[in-house]
Amino acid sequence: MGARSKARKRALDILYAAEMRGEEPATALDRAIAAGEGPTNDYTSDLVRGVVEHRPRIDELLADYSEGWTLDRMPAVDRNVLRLGVFELMWADDVPDAVAVTEAVALVQDLSTDESPGFVNGVLGAVLRNKDALTR
């Protein structure tokens, strides 16, 4: 697993744990860093802070492109992987779009339901197809 793949997994861990605790992700990140358990890769922090900064727009896009699913109905892992994927597609200009989608699908393949890879691929694919028309 490459450095950025590990950073994505660690960012997912932080986002997921924060959601389960009812904590803000940035607070969870800062707490982990202060406790010496923080990410060793700056990209993890970039991902968590990016998702936090753009979360209203990310969640709006997910609501628009997750046909038949509300954010609340999605498994928490899928929801947070999708947030990471949309962030990378829309705001991480140094990440190729195909890599953002592939990495998101790989995360849910390992950590979520059997249906999750197809769902995540479909949602991110729809965002990607419409990316040029979407406002950041």
Q: What are these language model-derived features?
A:
Residues 1-136:
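N-terminal interaction/assembly modules
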